[in-house]
Amino acid sequence: MHLTPDQTIFWQWGLFSLNATLIFTWLVMGVLVVGSWFVTRHLSASTQISRGQNLLEVIVLGIRDQIQEIIDQPADPYLPFIGTLFIFIALSNLLSVIPGYQPPTGSLSTTTALALCVFFAVPLYGVQKKGVRGYLQQYLQPNPIMLPFNIIGDFSRIVALAVRLFGNVMSGTMIVGILLSVAPLFFPVMMQVLGLLTGVIQAYIFAILAMVFIAAASQVDQHNYQTDSEVSHG
């Protein structure tokens, strides 16, 4: 039994190899592209909408509401990035119902890449919200001696984000393999249902943690935020 999709090699030439992580990552992206085109090709602003558009609106509005609850600010600037993370991870895990499929989130390289996306998104959103000087000043809080610790804290959060998702998905794969060897007829059905639920939960937690990190970097004084809002609406 392969613990990670990196161990499943389909083709290798010298130092270059084509493993299950790459194959199934492209599969997930392909499903997302085709699914997005299929659902959005006939979008309508009327009250009579298709089931696909209705499902899409439920997902988008649900993600936006969750972001809104976390940051207590307009969620639209963060919705594309956080929504993409959630949908990609959730779909990667949900496709596990397909025989032979191995979730790319079970590879440390995939979870590290996702965590790096969050790592670079944090300062981008922070600078956009607070400016370069305002963003860099937070590393000197509460006093300049905390600078190295604040920097280490940023790196440690990203490492924890990558390892946490990888560990949960890999451990799920190991448990399924053990139960299949013990009772191959009864436990697979239960584990499939539990695996689907766990996959969505892991995607939700990853997206929430990413949003928390971004919100911490782009947090502005609430009084200033309210004043700016009043000026823009006044």
Curated annotation (Swiss-Prot):
<dbReference type="GO" id="GO:0046933">
    <property type="term" value="F:proton-transporting ATP synthase activity, rotational mechanism"/>
</dbReference>
<comment type="similarity">
    <text>Belongs to the ATPase A chain family.</text>
</comment>
<keyword id="KW-0812">Transmembrane</keyword>
<keyword id="KW-0066">ATP synthesis</keyword>
<feature type="transmembrane region" description="Helical">
    <location>
        <begin position="78"/>
        <end position="98"/>
    </location>
</feature>
<keyword id="KW-0793">Thylakoid</keyword>
<comment type="subunit">
    <text>F-type ATPases have 2 components, CF(1) - the catalytic core - and CF(0) - the membrane proton channel. CF(1) has five subunits: alpha(3), beta(3), gamma(1), delta(1), epsilon(1). CF(0) has four main subunits: a, b, b' and c.</text>
</comment>
<dbReference type="GO" id="GO:0031676">
    <property type="term" value="C:plasma membrane-derived thylakoid membrane"/>
</dbReference>
<dbReference type="InterPro" id="IPR045082">
    <property type="entry name" value="ATP_syn_F0_a_bact/chloroplast"/>
</dbReference>
<feature type="transmembrane region" description="Helical">
    <location>
        <begin position="169"/>
        <end position="189"/>
    </location>
</feature>
<dbReference type="GO" id="GO:0045259">
    <property type="term" value="C:proton-transporting ATP synthase complex"/>
</dbReference>
<keyword id="KW-0614">Plasmid</keyword>
<keyword id="KW-0406">Ion transport</keyword>
<feature type="transmembrane region" description="Helical">
    <location>
        <begin position="194"/>
        <end position="214"/>
    </location>
</feature>
<feature type="transmembrane region" description="Helical">
    <location>
        <begin position="20"/>
        <end position="40"/>
    </location>
</feature>
<keyword id="KW-0375">Hydrogen ion transport</keyword>
<dbReference type="InterPro" id="IPR000568">
    <property type="entry name" value="ATP_synth_F0_asu"/>
</dbReference>
<keyword id="KW-0138">CF(0)</keyword>
<dbReference type="InterPro" id="IPR017692">
    <property type="entry name" value="Alt_ATP_synth_F0_Asu"/>
</dbReference>
<protein>
    <recommendedName>
        <fullName>ATP synthase subunit a 2</fullName>
    </recommendedName>
</protein>
<keyword id="KW-0813">Transport</keyword>
<comment type="function">
    <text>Key component of the proton channel; it plays a direct role in the translocation of protons across the membrane.</text>
</comment>
<dbReference type="InterPro" id="IPR023011">
    <property type="entry name" value="ATP_synth_F0_asu_AS"/>
</dbReference>
<feature type="transmembrane region" description="Helical">
    <location>
        <begin position="107"/>
        <end position="127"/>
    </location>
</feature>
<keyword id="KW-1133">Transmembrane helix</keyword>
<keyword id="KW-0472">Membrane</keyword>
<dbReference type="InterPro" id="IPR035908">
    <property type="entry name" value="F0_ATP_A_sf"/>
</dbReference>
<dbReference type="Pfam" id="PF00119">
    <property type="entry name" value="ATP-synt_A"/>
</dbReference>
<dbReference type="GO" id="GO:0042777">
    <property type="term" value="P:proton motive force-driven plasma membrane ATP synthesis"/>
</dbReference>
